[in-house]
Amino acid sequence: VDFTFAPCLDLDYGQSAVIGNRAFHRNPRVVSILATAMVSGMAQAGMACCGKHFPGHGYATADSHVELPVDDRPLTDIRTNDEVPYASMGTLLTSVMPAHVTYPQVSPAPAGFSKKWLQEELRGRLGYNGLIFSDDLSMKGASEVGEITARSDAALAAGCDMILICNDPESAKTVLENQRWIRTKAFD
């Protein structure tokens, strides 16, 4: 399978150094148009994709690789801006990756560990039926959930179909040896 963790569907609010030039644009409709063209080209070449970082990492200023970012906006703001590319692209997205960002007005848990975000918003309201990959569980933005096995448990319980542990072989080994694996409906 030819696959990439792209496109980045985050909006460029001009305040997130970690997203920065990874974002296509500030306008969600422009992001949707450009990302659709990118994904269509990838599909023609036989490559699967992953839209990230649901519901949006562009507004939060902190870098989730080193700390847990917080986005204090209400759900209505996020829906009318950051979720637009996900809503417009729908089944074009082979998979989606949630953000290691907390949205306290919506859920106390970071999006990748939140049933509110993954089950109610992404799968429920937006009707998304593809795969959900966690973001890298070895990132500092995920560490507030607990140790590595607790993170993998929480991501899977929230609705992730697959978990990622990058550049940390010992943590990957710990999860492989201790995780209670379940089959999700995405594989049926």
Place the predicted regions along the sequence by residue.
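Surface-exposed, active-site-proximal loop segments in enzymatic domains
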Residues: G14-F24, D63-P69
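Second-shell residues forming the walls of enzyme active-site clefts
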Residues: V30-F187
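Mid-sequence acidic-hydrophobic segments that form the walls
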Residues: D2, D12, G41, A45
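Short glycine-enriched loops at secondary-structure junctions
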Residues: D2-L11, G51-H57
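Conserved aromatic
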Residues: F24-H25, V145
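Residues forming well-ordered secondary-structure scaffolds
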Residues: T4, I19, R26-A37
